[in-house]
Amino acid sequence: MASKKIRTRFAPSPTGYMHVGNLRTALYAYLIAKHEAGDFILRIEDTDQERLVDGAVDIIYNTLKLTGLNHDEGPDVGGNVGPYVQSERKAIYLEYAKNLVEKGEAYYCFCSKDRLDMLKENAEALKRPFKYDKHCLHLTKEEIEANLAKGLPYVIRQNNPTTGSTTFDDVIYGKITVDNSELEDMILIKSDGLPTYNFANVVDDHLMGITHIVRGNEYLSSSPKYNRLYEAFGWDIPVYVHCPPIMKDTHNKLSKRNGDASFEDLMKKGYLKDAVLNYIALLGWNPGTNEEIFNLEELTQKFDFKDISKSPAIFDDAKLKWMNGEYIRKLSLDEFHELAVPEYKKVLKKDFDLKFISELLHTRCELLSDLAEQIDFLEELPEYSTDLYVHKKMKSTVESSLENLQKVLPIIEEIDEANWNKDYIHEKVFELIKSLEIKNGQMLWPIRTALSGKSFTPGGAFELAILLGKEESISRLKKGIELLK
């Protein structure tokens, strides 16, 4: 018998920005499908109407498009098993919930908010988790019909057993058994007629033919209840792939509620989309080699969901920044320059050779948003301490710096504008270094410091002189001499 075509889904709630954890779920679902030439479906889960955020659906579309995680079916591209927006499927869920009621697998609950609040307070007083007491399970058919006729608000709850156990399999975590006494009678249909997330995703996953479900391990505890729904309907249970949490550090989960970076934030900080996607792929998955740089096509070929780890993944900003630098260096100079110019223009108003700046920074840049800070001294010399002139490796001191700047200044002043180029300046300065019988760094470090007022610069002394021009270079050398006196 031929195996079923792999079908995965990304089913986000449009409640704001695309969080890193959500993007990883989308990526893993995409890779599982595409590794086996399957289908990747986008479904919008908007049943929690109070949490919806205007524009959030567009963020989902834009992020998937930008990262290349193109879906085969979805609200914007259509498909054979739509609608792909849960709020447009309201009648479907109610029909299936009523079917469960008829089977005795679910029941109407008319309990008031006051009664439910009382149950919660009692549970808190006893320091036990809240669990509905099945009060409405025992209503007769006549009582239920009378309540419905009166128009009393109701929810439909799952009827879970209180004895025995339920076992389910997860690709990552293995076989898990839960005592049925721990299962709550979760709400399937809310009082507004919309399904809960828990119910809608089971119905939709079945009707849309989803074979593999990728989600965070926080849903492990709900999986026995999902399984009981599948079994109650007589449906095949899909393959579960529960992913480990992404941690900010060893104690705290990465969370959009705590203001941790969303995909949009990372883009604004100057990260490249391909670097972010590559890094996120490695948050919980290991290719089994030391190789770490993969484009989306390479990830699709190599990804095996069975290699996803149980262990929490730490979101390491330094590692992401390193990886981003690797991707920046893979860009052509023209590609890098195009991305860098908007950053330069944030701080540079005067006329500079921007392409030359890009040539200097291309191999040194790790983050586009760092560029402005690395070149702002070109526009205006910052105030700086004479401590910058002290450099042990360069054998440079405050005293030697003053002496060497005073000796190089007339050499610089004598260079004609026509000869103001790197090779000629280099030749003249090195003639002086040779005649003084000093180390190169003893001359070059103070020149660089005087021209920039910074410990890090995009180029050395000669590159800075070319960028600044003769007049500005001489002015800054004189300021350095005055500061050192």
UniProtKB/Swiss-Prot annotation:
GO biological process: glutamyl-tRNA aminoacylation
Compartments, record wording: Cytoplasm
Keywords assigned by UniProt, alphabetized: Aminoacyl-tRNA synthetase, ATP-binding, Cytoplasm, Ligase, Metal-binding, Nucleotide-binding, Protein biosynthesis, Zinc
Database matches in CDD domains: GluRS_core
Binding residue positions for Zn(2+): 109, 111, 136, 138
Chain span(s) of sequence motif 'HIGH' region: 12-22
Cofactor(s) of this protein: Zn(2+)
GO MF assignments: ATP binding; glutamate-tRNA ligase activity; tRNA binding; zinc ion binding
Ranges in a coiled coil: none
Motif 'KMSKS' region location, chain numbering: 253-257
Gene Ontology CC terms, in alphabetical order: cytoplasm
Role summary: Catalyzes the attachment of glutamate to tRNA(Glu) in a two-step reaction: glutamate is first activated by ATP to form Glu-AMP and then transferred to the acceptor end of tRNA(Glu).
Subunit description: Monomer.
Name under which the protein is recorded: Glutamate--tRNA ligase
Organism: Clostridium botulinum (strain Alaska E43 / Type E3)
